[in-house]
């Protein structure tokens, strides 16, 4: 299963970007034996729409397009799965998150898209299409830190699925 991260906004050079790249590199190396291929990060420009509703709709359109491209030609069990990061989402532990990623892979999903929304959050239509709306705890995180956290959790999920001792429960 190809795993992509879609993030609204750019991450500038600096220590945060280096840390994100380090964890995504680890995930890219740990994933293939488990059937998880890291396909990279797609940065979506922040919308300049006049209202929050318009901005969310414009940002969601690009994620919809990626999902449609992944699902074209697929069956209901194939295609793409979507996880949205949202402070109002479900809070999971690392082992539960790893189990969900593993189940999506085992169910024959060809692609997993993890989407980090813009400052206004996600469009309601996109939220309703998501397979999982996930909160990274009850705190609100800047987008740069959310990227670091999901990069680390994807790597951790791969190590959990592999039985590697990185994760100590």
UniProtKB/Swiss-Prot annotation:
Membrane spanning residue stretches: none
SUPFAM superfamilies, alphabetized: alpha/beta knot (SSF75217)
InterPro entries associated with the record: Alpha/beta_knot_MTases, RlmH-like, tRNA_m1G_MTases_N
An example Gene Ontology CC term for this record: cytoplasm
UniProt keywords, alphabetically: Cytoplasm, Methyltransferase, rRNA processing, S-adenosyl-L-methionine, Transferase
Cytoplasm found in the keyword field: yes
Reactions accelerated catalytically: pseudouridine(1915) in 23S rRNA + S-adenosyl-L-methionine = N(3)-methylpseudouridine(1915) in 23S rRNA + S-adenosyl-L-homocysteine + H(+)
Subunit structure: Homodimer.
Protein name: Ribosomal RNA large subunit methyltransferase H
Organism of this sequence: Brucella abortus (strain 2308)
Classification lineage: Bacteria, Pseudomonadati, Pseudomonadota, Alphaproteobacteria, Hyphomicrobiales
């Amino acid at each position: 299963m190809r795993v992509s991260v879609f993030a609204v906004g750019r991450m500038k050079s600096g220590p945060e970007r280096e840390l994100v790249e380090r964890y995504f590199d680890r995930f890219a190396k740990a994933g293939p034996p488990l059937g998880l291929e890291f396909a990279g990060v797609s940065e979506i420009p922040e919308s300049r729409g006049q209202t929050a509703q318009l901005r969310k709709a414009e940002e969601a359109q690009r994620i919809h397009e990626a999902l449609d491209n992944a699902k074209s030609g697929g069956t209901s069990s194939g295609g793409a799965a979507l996880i949205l990061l949202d402070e109002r989402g479900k809070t999971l532990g690392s082992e539960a998150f790893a189990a969900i990623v593993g189940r999506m892979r085992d169910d024959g999903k060809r692609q997993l898209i993890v989407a980090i929304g813009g400052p206004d959050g996600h469009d309601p239509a996109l939220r309703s299409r998501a397979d999982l709306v996930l909160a990274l705890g009850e705190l609100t995180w800047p987008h740069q830190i959310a990227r670091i956290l999901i990069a680390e959790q994807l790597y951790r999920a791969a190590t959990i699925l592999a039985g590697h001792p990185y994760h100590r429960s």
